[in-house]
């Protein structure tokens, strides 16, 4: 997502660092690079001009000249202006005071309306709503069938009285279907109605007339314009045409996971004045989220998206299990069973590469992230599942014959089993040292108190009271996901992330005082 734009902007701002004072020439050179980066990303020219003008004005003002770190202040200005053109504040879906809330989807053919309808329905269902999908795309062959398949995957009913375009059936009336779907929702007490309409390969009067007729028939609370982020400069033209012909209250961006330059996201909000509500980043139903302008700007500038990562963790981790795992890690008692549970929870959050990409500075290690293969985690999972409960609880009992049995049972080599067991012990020791060194209450003290009484130094004599014992060797922090020890060293295929950029083991600015104990994890069911 925005990889090329992120690389160009990061490189442009990197040249300012280390300078105690910025000259007009420095500002001009930096804004020139930013301008080229935005234009290459297919951002609309008027948007680029206004964006660069605002940055220059602020960069030459008092807020930069009087700052202790002028370069960092310019980065802050660019971040704030990016947030501004992306919409400023997060805008949620507006629900009607009296159900049902009617959401109409409009857009060009192939923009992803039908799939997005299922994603939105699945999200609303997860929030406790009872959505109904209405199939009003009666012109594209198999469009109704596609919506029924998507609705079944999302666990949401589909209202489709007409089979859609086919040689056997005549043309249907999408306006009548939309009105009947709304009546069906009221009769059966659905609180949200999502209407999937037909698209075209281009803007034409027939498309506009049909969409406007459906809008007038159902009087929707929200009209979402579904925009393909890969269409480049045409995004502005298409959005403006739909705005004049039909009118819409929000934008949903699709295909943000593609390799396109993605300038549509930076243009459509500024040109139309309509907020971006949702962003779709994949084909799965869960690859869909509310669009946060501040987080998107942070990711574009290579500063990561820690808050989204935390929110995803809150959805999959159980509070009690997380506390128990943290206590076991601190005491050096983490088992392979605990490790397996944590790994399965992390995998529910999405591909590991995507999760690591949300960390600050991840853009500097793209090559390493590109090597991350989730299939290697399947092999690790198979190895652990091939062990007996006793072996998972106490890996020390896994001798040579047991390792051979585990390898044969899980379809891997003995060396892979050896690597997993050995690196599990190393990671458990490292994580115990890390948590103990952080001074977290109740963590890391159990194992420490065991050795506090009668502790002996290298000479075999007891340490004198009040004197320091031998300094323990420094242990390098493993780079991995919380609760997943030794991710960097799992067998075969996973990259060595030990050479991570400076600062990745720290929270980014603004989150330094973040209290992890206040995270709201779902309770144990």
UniProtKB/Swiss-Prot annotation:
The keyword Amino-acid biosynthesis appears for this protein: no
Matches recorded under SMART domains: AAA, SRP54, SRP54_N
Record's compositionally biased regions (Low complexity): 480-497
Annotated control of activity: The SRP-FtsY complex formation results in mutual stimulation of their GTP hydrolysis activity.
Disruption phenotype: Depletion of ffh (SRP) and ftsY results in differential expression of 14 proteins.
CC per GO annotation: peptidoglycan-based cell wall; plasma membrane; signal recognition particle
Amino acid composition bias (Basic residues), ranges on this chain: 447-467
Keywords: Cytoplasm, GTP-binding, Hydrolase, Nucleotide-binding, Ribonucleoprotein, RNA-binding, Signal recognition particle
EC number: 3.6.5.4
Name the record gives this protein: Signal recognition particle protein
Native source species: Mycobacterium tuberculosis (strain ATCC 25618 / H37Rv)
Protein encoded by which gene: ffh
């Amino acid at each position: 997502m925005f990889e090329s734009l992120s690389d160009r902007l990061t490189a442009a701002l990197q040249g300012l660092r280390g300078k105690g004072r910025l000259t007009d020439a420095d500002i001009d050179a930096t804004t020139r690079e930013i301008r080229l980066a935005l234009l290459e990303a297919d951002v609309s020219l008027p948007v680029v001009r206004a964006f660069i003008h605002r940055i220059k004005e602020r960069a030459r003002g008092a807020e930069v000249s009087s700052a202790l770190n002028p370069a960092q202040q310019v980065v802050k200005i660019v971040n704030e202006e990016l947030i501004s053109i992306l919409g400023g504040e997060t805008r949620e879906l507006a629900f009607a005071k009296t159900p049902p809330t009617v959401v109409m989807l409009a857009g060009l053919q192939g923009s992803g309306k039908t799939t997005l309808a299922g994603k939105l329905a699945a999200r609303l269902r997860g929030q406790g709503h009872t959505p109904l999908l209405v199939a009003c795309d009666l012109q594209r062959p198999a469009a109704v069938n596609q919506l029924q398949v998507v609705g079944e995957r999302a666990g949401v009913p589909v209202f489709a009285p007409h089979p859609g375009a086919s040689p056997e059936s005549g043309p249907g009336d999408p306006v009548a279907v939309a009105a009947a779907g709304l009546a069906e929702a009221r009769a059966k007490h659905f609180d949200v109605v999502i209407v999937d309409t037909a698209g075209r390969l281009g803007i034409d009067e027939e498309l506009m007339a049909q969409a406007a007729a459906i809008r007038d028939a159902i009087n929707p609370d929200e009209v979402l314009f579904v925009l393909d982020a890969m269409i480049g400069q045409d995004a502005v033209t298409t959005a403006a045409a739909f705005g004049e012909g039909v009118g819409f209250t929000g934008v949903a961006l699709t295909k943000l996971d593609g390799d396109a330059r993605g300038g549509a996201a930076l243009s459509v909000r500024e040109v139309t004045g309509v907020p971006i509500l949702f962003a779709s980043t994949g084909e799965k139903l869960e690859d869909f989220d509310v669009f946060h302008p501040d987080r998107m700007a942070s990711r574009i500038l290579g500063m990561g998206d820690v808050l989204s990562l935390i929110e995803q963790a809150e959805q999959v981790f159980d509070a009690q299990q997380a506390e128990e795992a943290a206590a076991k890690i601190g005491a050096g008692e983490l088992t392979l069973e605990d490790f397996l549970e944590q790994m399965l929870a992390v995998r529910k959050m999405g591909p590991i590469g995507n999760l690591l990409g949300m960390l600050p500075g991840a853009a500097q290690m793209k090559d390493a992230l590109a090597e991350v293969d989730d299939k290697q985690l399947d092999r690790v999972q198979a190895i652990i599942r091939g062990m007996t409960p006793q072996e998972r609880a106490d890996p020390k009992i896994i001798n040579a014959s047991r390792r051979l049995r585990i390898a044969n049972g899980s379809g891997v080599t003995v060396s892979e089993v050896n690597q997993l067991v050995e690196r599990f012990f190393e990671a458990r020791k490292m994580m115990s040292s890390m948590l103990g060194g952080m001074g977290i209450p109740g963590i890391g003290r159990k194992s420490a108190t065991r050795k506090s009484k009668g502790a002996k130094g290298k000479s075999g004599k007891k340490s004198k009271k009040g004197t320091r014992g031998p300094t323990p060797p420094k242990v390098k922090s493993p780079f991995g996901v919380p609760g997943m020890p030794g991710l960097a060293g799992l067998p075969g295929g996973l990259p060595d992330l030990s050479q991570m950029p400076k600062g990745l083991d720290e929270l980014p600015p603004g989150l330094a005082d973040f209290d992890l104990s206040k995270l709201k994890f779902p309770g144990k069911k």
